[in-house]
Amino acid sequence: MNYFIFLVVACLLTAGTEGKKDGYPVEGDNCAFACFGYDNAYCDKLCKDKKADSGYCYWVHILCYCYGLPDKEPTKTSGRCKPGKK
């Protein structure tokens, strides 16, 4: 009986929650957003426009990196960037 109550409580706590992820946001062509000049303000705004918690310019790759993106928002995969292909 205790396991059943625990299971019900666990289901109620997770119902309706949307997962969040971190990563490089992309358009449909798998191209990430460049941030020349290490513009953290640009990346933070871009990420927040995509409903992320925050973002910054990752200087090693010169790309915007977001924290807390919604699961439905596409992020960079291991494939190559294909400009113009949506």
Swiss-Prot record:
It is found in: Secreted. Keywords: Amidation, Disulfide bond, Ion channel impairing toxin, Neurotoxin, Secreted, Signal, Toxin, Voltage-gated sodium channel impairing toxin. Gene3D superfamilies: Knottin, scorpion toxin-like. InterPro entries: LCN-type_CS_alpha_beta_dom, Scorpion_toxin-like, Scorpion_toxin-like_sf, Scorpion_toxinL, Scorpion_toxinL/defensin. Residues 21-82 form the LCN-type CS-alpha/beta domain. The keyword Cell membrane does not apply. Its main location: secreted. PROSITE patterns: LCN_CSAB (PS51863). Disulfide bonds join C31-C81, C35-C57, C43-C64, C47-C66. One of its GO terms (molecular function) is toxin activity. Residues 1-19 form the signal peptide. It holds the Pfam family Toxin_3. Expressed by the venom gland. GO terms for cellular component: extracellular region. Alpha toxins bind voltage-independently at site-3 of sodium channels (Nav) and inhibit the inactivation of the activated channels, thereby blocking neuronal transmission. This is Putative sodium channel toxin Ts17. It comes from Tityus serrulatus.
